[in-house]
């Protein structure tokens, strides 16, 4: 039952004063009674006695002892009741004044819909609220409660959305753990291949150097053997010449002609043959560059498929070079993934230079191959939820589609008519960023199909792979190996 605003629920002032400690003048806390009959807080009287030689009552000064302290349960109960009633009185006063107009002291029975304020009957005539829509509190509360129920429903839906988003992040975290383990193994395999390539190259260079060293050592040994033999011949000739010089004059001169002819036939020493030193530059000169070029020759693909952009219909091979449409399967949600069509992107972003790639289409009956502009605000993933893939939305491609008179090739430019060309089984794409040209060729027939002219900006390779029309197994779309060359420019 609601109390009248005129009734005061609080205790009398004199009664409250009887429940105050004579030391701290606050309501008793753990009240105790001395032998003389006076009451104090246990803590207050204990602090007073700490500075006294002989404990006495703080009021009448009678002698006392800590052993005389007796807990006064009745007084403690009265203090607890007093504090409880004061708290209740404070709440009642707050409640009573919160429902009364502070300006006119009237009952708050109206609500201003413009100012969103509670009003009394006198406030309604106030100039500040003239012309405003005013409703009774009960009606307004009913309307606002209905709105709050709608807000509650909206908040519950938002909470469900947050919970669904949390489950999405849980799925992403689990996917990343599995993907990281698989990716770690693949990375190690690829680096093992690189290390094996470098090991083979290192061994080949060391073997070539060892073979050159062996050949030049054999040549040096042969030359040294020849020189040793010639030296021995000359030593024998010197010894013979010394003996002839000791003979008498007639004998010495008789042998002069044959001696001169013999000495003339002795060989002259040849200079050191060129190329006898190990060719250091052959093995160390630009070694890293030469090995890098050789390594580059083993790289056959200009880019790979990006599985993070692949729609739920598509499955990308482990080596990221082929993609197949196996029908829709639930994938981890991420903003980069296409959701409205079976599309995916290449791993590279092209903004300058010349680039080319070839795609094996085989007997695929529904495909698109081209590029898509990378949006500056959100990247290529800004296109992932778009249903309109044409030049107006940043897509440039050639595709195979069904027509009344059979399949034919068309472009993403709605202004062009269908291309009257045979369906290519292998498509070559050439992108000239600076020239603003994107050309398509039938790689098997070596014929030009179509060329877009536009300011492309930053683009990524774009692919669409429709489902199989027949009952046979789905065919993959593959990026074809190409020979990658390096253009060398020398300064000056």
Swiss-Prot record:
Domain called B30.2/SPRY: residue spans: 283-486
Recorded metabolic or biological pathway in which this protein acts: Protein modification; protein ubiquitination
Modified residues (Phosphoserine): 4, 8
Zn finger region (B box-type): 96-137
Gene Ontology MF terms: transferase activity; zinc ion binding
Localization annotation: Cytoplasm; Nucleus
GO terms for cellular component: cytoplasm; nucleus
Subunit annotation: Interacts with PKM isoform M2, but not isoform M1; this interaction may compete with that between PKM and FGFR1, and hence reduces FGFR1-dependent tyrosine phosphorylation of PKM. Interacts with IRF7; this interaction promotes IRF7 proteasomal degradation. Interacts with TRAF3; this interaction promotes TRAF3 activation.
UniProt name for this protein: E3 ubiquitin-protein ligase TRIM35
Organism: Pongo abelii (Sumatran orangutan)
Organism ancestry: Eukaryota, Metazoa, Chordata, Craniata, Vertebrata
Gene name linked to the record: TRIM35
């Amino acid at each position: 039952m609601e109390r009248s605003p005129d009734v005061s629920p609080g205790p009398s002032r004199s009664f409250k004063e009887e429940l105050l400690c004579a030391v701290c003048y606050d309501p008793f806390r753990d009240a105790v009674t001395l032998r003389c009959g006076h009451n104090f807080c246990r803590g207050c009287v204990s602090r007073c006695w700490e500075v006294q030689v002989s404990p006495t009552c703080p009021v009448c000064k009678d002698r006392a002892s800590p052993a005389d302290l007796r807990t006064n349960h009745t007084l403690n109960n009265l203090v607890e009741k007093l504090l409880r009633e004061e708290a209740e009185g404070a709440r009642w006063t707050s409640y009573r004044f919160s429902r009364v107009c502070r300006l006119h002291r009237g009952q708050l029975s109206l609500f201003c819909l413009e100012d969103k304020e509670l009003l009394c009957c006198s406030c309604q005539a106030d100039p500040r609220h003239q012309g405003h829509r005013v409703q009774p509190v009960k009606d307004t509360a009913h309307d606002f409660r209905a709105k709050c129920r709608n807000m509650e429903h909206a908040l519950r839906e938002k909470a469900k959305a947050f919970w669904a988003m949390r489950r999405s992040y849980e799925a992403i975290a689990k996917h990343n753990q599995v993907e990281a383990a698989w990716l770690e193994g693949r990375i190690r395999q690829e680096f093992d291949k690189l290390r094996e390539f470098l090991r083979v190259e290192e061994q080949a260079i060391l073997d070539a150097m060892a073979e050159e060293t062996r050949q030049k050592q054999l040549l040096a040994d042969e030359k040294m053997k020849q020189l040793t033999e010639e030296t021995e011949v000359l030593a024998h000739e010197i010894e013979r010449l010394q003996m002839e010089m000791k003979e008498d004059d007639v004998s010495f001169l008789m042998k002069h002609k044959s001696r001169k002819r013999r000495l003339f036939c002795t060989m002259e020493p040849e200079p050191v043959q060129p190329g006898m030193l190990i060719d250091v530059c052959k093995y160390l000169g630009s070694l890293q560059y030469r090995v890098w070029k050789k390594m580059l020759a083993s790289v056959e693909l200009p880019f790979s498929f990006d599985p993070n952009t692949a729609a739920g219909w598509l499955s990308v091979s482990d080596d990221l070079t082929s993609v197949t449409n196996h029908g829709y399967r639930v994938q981890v949600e991420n903003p980069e993934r296409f959701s409205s069509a079976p599309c995916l992107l290449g791993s590279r972003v092209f903004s300058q230079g010349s680039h080319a790639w070839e795609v094996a289409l085989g007997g695929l009956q529904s495909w698109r191959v081209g590029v898509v502009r990378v949006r500056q605000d959100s990247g290529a993933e800004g296109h992932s939820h778009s249903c309109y893939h044409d030049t107006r939305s940043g897509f440039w491609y050639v595709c195979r589609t069904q027509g009344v008179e059979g399949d034919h090739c068309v472009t993403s430019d709605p202004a062009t008519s269908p291309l009257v060309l045979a369906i290519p089984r292998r498509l070559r794409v050439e992108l000239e960023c600076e020239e603003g040209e994107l050309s398509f060729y039938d790689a098997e027939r070596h014929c030009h199909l179509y060329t877009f002219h536009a300011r492309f900006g930053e683009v990524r390779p774009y692919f669409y792979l429709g489902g199989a029309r027949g009952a046979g197994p789905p065919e993959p779309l593959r990026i074809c190996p190409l020979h990658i060359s390096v253009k060398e420019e020398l300064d000056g």
